[in-house]
Amino acid sequence: MLPLSLLRTGQGHQIMVELKNGETYNGLLVNCDNWMNINLKNVIRTSKDSDKFWKIQSCYIRGNTIKYISVPDEIIDLVAEEEQTLRTTYQQRNDSNRGRGRGDGFAGRGRGDASGRGRGDNSYRGGRGGGNNNSGGGDSSPAGRGRGEYRGSSRGGRGDFRGSSRGGRGGNNNSTA
């Protein structure tokens, strides 16, 4: 657990702060920020030698002067419970039916997507490899090579716009358009 989450949970509880110069502050934690600057109220300040005591209504302690912070065990238990509930809610949120890729609730990347790379089911947009309607496939095979042609051709390779026999790898380039 992070010290900042521990301090934020400890707001409203009694803590003891020891500074690098040896002074200690016991008081009620009002608030803390990202730099571990702390506001305390109803504070008892103890000198380095523990021979002088001061009662202070409220004080501000800069985070980079802090050496040690002592918090009650109940705060540690509260932080552990909060982290567990956050973890379960985060996991439940991520367990929705989103696919890989875009995260928009649809199939995303891979074989099932109609557009983009992969196999694709739309004859206007064949992906790499084969697919239905011979889109981008090679010689009517479901797993052709190359990128395929634009509209429903059975020839593989990059090819031209519509049904041209000119193309790259894969397919049967001997037939005419």
Curated annotation (Swiss-Prot):
GO terms for cellular component: nucleolus; P-body; spliceosomal complex; spliceosomal tri-snRNP complex; U4/U6 x U5 tri-snRNP complex; U6 snRNP. Keywords: mRNA processing, mRNA splicing, Nucleus, Ribonucleoprotein, RNA-binding, Spliceosome. Residues 126-139 have a biased composition (Gly residues). Residues 110-122, 146-163 have a biased composition (Basic and acidic residues). SUPFAM superfamilies: Sm-like ribonucleoproteins (SSF50182). InterPro entries: Lsm4, LSm4/Sm_D1/D3, LSM_dom_sf, Sm, Sm_dom_euk/arc. The keyword GTP-binding does not apply. One of its GO terms (biological process) is mRNA splicing, via spliceosome. Component of the precatalytic spliceosome (spliceosome B complex). Component of the U4/U6-U5 tri-snRNP complex, a building block of the precatalytic spliceosome (spliceosome B complex). LSM2, LSM3, LSM4, LSM5, LSM6, LSM7 and LSM8 form a heptameric, ring-shaped subcomplex (the LSM2-8 complex) that is part of the U4/U6-U5 tri-snRNP complex and the precatalytic spliceosome. This is Probable U6 snRNA-associated Sm-like protein LSm4. It comes from Dictyostelium discoideum.
